[in-house]
Amino acid sequence: MSERAVLLPKAALSCLKQRTQMKKVILFATLACMMSCNDKTAKTPAIDPSNFDLSVAPNEDFYQYATGGWQAKNPLKPEFSRFGSFDVLRENNEVRINDLFQEMTKIEAAPGSVDQKISDLYKMGLDSVRLNKEGAEPVKADLAAIMQVEKGPALTKALTEMMLDVGNPLFAFGVMADLMDSNTNAFYLEQSGLGMGNRDYYLEESNAALKKGYEELLAKLFVLSGTEEAEAKRAAADVVAFETELARASWSNVELRDIARSYNPMSVADLKKRYDAIDWEVLFDELGKVQVAGIDRAIVGQPSFFEGMNKLVKQTPIETLRYYLAAQYLTSAASYLSDDFYAASFDFFGRQMAGKEEQRPRWKRAMSIPNSVLGEAVGEMYVAKYFPAKDKERMLELVGNLQTALGEHIAALDWMSDATKAKAQEKL
């Protein structure tokens, strides 16, 4: 993809997404503990009676009884589709990070430094005048390249570049601990490629309005990027039809929970033989340049999906595949382009799908760019300002206490064998 566009990857999709949920829980738990080191939050009671709604009987509506007071104190803001205690942490954290970025815009950073890059990305996100003036210009070169793609190596190269930069067309890949040998890492291939994420949005009749709204979004994005309206509508319909067939091949959420069924090691030779619509040598070569090399096998999550995807790619006209890639690209890029692109994206993904009433303020959108692109550098800055050494010592002590308590609990279990206890203690 062209270096002109600053785009971010979509959230992890399908089974890979499910497998990373615990990491997010740990991240927010850590953030909560870090923020609790602050004197102000340390005084907050573990159970605040004002968060209850005592006017409701717990046996009638326990949720309202337990959280009614908190809900009254924290009304749902128009930019949210839901709001809970973790969202409070996220909101507080965003304010802190934004303060860091604002401070950086006031200093003279060394050219080429991380500070300068973070500052430039942040200011670029805030510059609505520039973004609206540029319109689709930042993505035109990439779109032109996509519309020249042919089946074979060129298609796989385009897919891989997009997977590394802006999304997961057709399928997703990732490296994580081997589920059968946690001491080694494995290369995973998982189903993906649906613009709306969930197969049910395409296949369930009750979601017909969403499916229509998605088609209208794609047509609008194609028009904004320079396609004639009639052609844009036809292309959008073709893309949705293609994704619907991809959804038919996709596993349901229930099927994705079957870990044993989702563990299917295959050699590279097997991949080439079974799923020959993809040029696996090209994919691995591209990955080896930037991310991971020496792949000799893959764990395929959903073999039947890949069989269906392989057949679908072979029988689909190249023009439809080009527009499909363009749709994947534009839905990822829309939030970082001009206001008309962002509004189109929000009207569908934010308003129609999620029930949000209002766009996120620009400062939050701007703040999220360097926070995503240069997250490790931002994290280092955050820790330096908000997590002093004394708080780290307290956190290490807390973790140590948890390990000790869990170890004692495991040792006292009468239903666990000694061998299993030993393995459990190792994991602590």
Q: Positions of the model-derived regions?
A:
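Extended, non-catalytic substrate-recognition/exosite surfaces adjacent to catalytic cores, especially
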Residues: 389-428
